[in-house]
Amino acid sequence: MTYVVFLLSVMFVMGFVGFSSKPSPIYGGLGLIVSGGVGCGIVLSFGGSFLGLMMFLIYLGGMLVVFGYTTAMATEEYPETWGSNVMILGMFVLGVLMEVGLVVYMVMSDGVEIVVDFKNMGDWVVFEGDEVGLIREDSMGVAALYSYGSWLMVVAGWSLFVSIFIVIEITRGA
């Protein structure tokens, strides 16, 4: 399980490397969506199943609106890719090589604690059992969200629905 979290963390960083060296807004939005999905996978690996799914759905809904808006405003007939400019390609390759070097150092050496200190890993645990009893934070939060915050869900869903039509209207050019 540690290797899965380590691999997801590497993919998370690589998504942000792709975002930071974006040649066109289309690829920047794609990098953010990939990083969001991998980040939800990290939350899922620590036991926060419904919390990770809800975070991904809300994040993806908001990102699709922003992604559609930036694509509409910065439409290019021939968008630049990572390989079309030597400087952009060099920065992307440099970021990838730095991440690969860090991964090789962490896997091959015995002193992993030198790079990353895992003393407070209990702060990242979503599902934790004690002698008193177990209460799942994500299920209790979902119950509160649907019982007390039902109008908040309706307003949030309606806002995303209306914003999709706004983005469609902007892209149409009317």
UniProtKB/Swiss-Prot annotation:
<protein>
    <recommendedName>
        <fullName>NADH-ubiquinone oxidoreductase chain 6</fullName>
        <ecNumber>7.1.1.2</ecNumber>
    </recommendedName>
</protein>
<dbReference type="InterPro" id="IPR042106">
    <property type="entry name" value="Nuo/plastoQ_OxRdtase_6_NuoJ"/>
</dbReference>
<keyword id="KW-0520">NAD</keyword>
<keyword id="KW-0496">Mitochondrion</keyword>
<comment type="subunit">
    <text>Core subunit of respiratory chain NADH dehydrogenase (Complex I) which is composed of 45 different subunits.</text>
</comment>
<keyword id="KW-1133">Transmembrane helix</keyword>
<feature type="transmembrane region" description="Helical">
    <location>
        <begin position="24"/>
        <end position="44"/>
    </location>
</feature>
<keyword id="KW-0249">Electron transport</keyword>
<keyword id="KW-0830">Ubiquinone</keyword>
<feature type="transmembrane region" description="Helical">
    <location>
        <begin position="86"/>
        <end position="106"/>
    </location>
</feature>
<comment type="function">
    <text>Core subunit of the mitochondrial membrane respiratory chain NADH dehydrogenase (Complex I) which catalyzes electron transfer from NADH through the respiratory chain, using ubiquinone as an electron acceptor. Essential for the catalytic activity and assembly of complex I.</text>
</comment>
<keyword id="KW-0813">Transport</keyword>
<feature type="transmembrane region" description="Helical">
    <location>
        <begin position="46"/>
        <end position="66"/>
    </location>
</feature>
<keyword id="KW-0679">Respiratory chain</keyword>
<dbReference type="InterPro" id="IPR001457">
    <property type="entry name" value="NADH_UbQ/plastoQ_OxRdtase_su6"/>
</dbReference>
<dbReference type="Pfam" id="PF00499">
    <property type="entry name" value="Oxidored_q3"/>
</dbReference>
<dbReference type="GO" id="GO:0045271">
    <property type="term" value="C:respiratory chain complex I"/>
</dbReference>
<dbReference type="InterPro" id="IPR050269">
    <property type="entry name" value="ComplexI_Subunit6"/>
</dbReference>
<keyword id="KW-0472">Membrane</keyword>
<keyword id="KW-0999">Mitochondrion inner membrane</keyword>
<dbReference type="GO" id="GO:0005743">
    <property type="term" value="C:mitochondrial inner membrane"/>
</dbReference>
<dbReference type="GO" id="GO:0032981">
    <property type="term" value="P:mitochondrial respiratory chain complex I assembly"/>
</dbReference>
<dbReference type="GO" id="GO:0008137">
    <property type="term" value="F:NADH dehydrogenase (ubiquinone) activity"/>
</dbReference>
<feature type="transmembrane region" description="Helical">
    <location>
        <begin position="1"/>
        <end position="21"/>
    </location>
</feature>
<keyword id="KW-1278">Translocase</keyword>
<dbReference type="GO" id="GO:0006120">
    <property type="term" value="P:mitochondrial electron transport, NADH to ubiquinone"/>
</dbReference>
<feature type="transmembrane region" description="Helical">
    <location>
        <begin position="151"/>
        <end position="171"/>
    </location>
</feature>
<comment type="similarity">
    <text>Belongs to the complex I subunit 6 family.</text>
</comment>
<keyword id="KW-0812">Transmembrane</keyword>
